[in-house]
């Protein structure tokens, strides 16, 4: 496996580890999710270019569209939670607390 693929997989694993470690803050979780989506985009683009899959050139663009939608929904949720509670703790999103 070339070193570029190893570095991209390591970036994905680092973002996944960041999501697991910093799961108490919504902003940190959103940044780690964006890092995961970016590494998946770069990895899928490199695989498609290396394997010469001409029919699947739209897959990375579709992945970017879903990443943009995820970022928009995440930022809207962050604004809503910070305006309601004043903090970005994920524990505030528990619906069982009344």
Swiss-Prot record:
The family database entries (InterPro entries) matched by this protein are listed as: NADH_UbQ_OxRdtase_chain4L/K, NUOK/Mnh_C1-like
| Enzyme Commission number, as recorded | 7.1.1.2
- Could you mention a single GO BP entry for this protein? ATP synthesis coupled electron transport
Q: Does the keyword Transport apply?
A: yes
Q: What is this protein called?
A: NADH-ubiquinone oxidoreductase chain 4L
Query: From which source organism is this entry?
Result: Propithecus diadema diadema
Query: Listed GO molecular functions?
Result: NADH dehydrogenase (ubiquinone) activity
Transmembrane parts of this sequence: 2-22, 29-49, 61-81
Its quaternary structure?
Answer: Core subunit of respiratory chain NADH dehydrogenase (Complex I) which is composed of 45 different subunits.
> Which top class of enzyme applies to this chain?
translocase
Q: Which Gene3D superfamilies match?
A: 1.10.287.3510
Function, in words: Core subunit of the mitochondrial membrane respiratory chain NADH dehydrogenase (Complex I) which catalyzes electron transfer from NADH through the respiratory chain, using ubiquinone as an electron acceptor. Part of the enzyme membrane arm which is embedded in the lipid bilayer and involved in proton translocation.
Q: Which reaction does it catalyse?
A: a ubiquinone + NADH + 5 H(+)(in) = a ubiquinol + NAD(+) + 4 H(+)(out)
Q: Which PANTHER family match?
A: NADH-UBIQUINONE OXIDOREDUCTASE CHAIN 4L (PTHR11434:SF0), NADH-UBIQUINONE OXIDOREDUCTASE SUBUNIT ND4L (PTHR11434)
Q: Which gene encodes it?
A: MT-ND4L
According to Swiss-Prot or TrEMBL, what is its membrane topology? Multi-pass membrane protein
């Amino acid at each position: 496996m070339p070193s570029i693929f190893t570095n991209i997989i390591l970036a994905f694993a680092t973002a996944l580890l960041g999501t697991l470690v910093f799961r108490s803050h919504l902003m940190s979780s959103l940044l780690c999710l964006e890092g995961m989506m970016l590494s998946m985009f770069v990895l899928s683009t490199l695989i498609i270019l290396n394997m010469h899959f001409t029919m699947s050139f739209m897959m990375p663009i579709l992945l970017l569209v879903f990443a943009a939608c995820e970022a928009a929904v995440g930022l809207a949720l962050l604004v809503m939670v910070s305006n309601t509670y004043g903090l970005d703790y994920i524990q505030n999103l528990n619906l069982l607390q009344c």
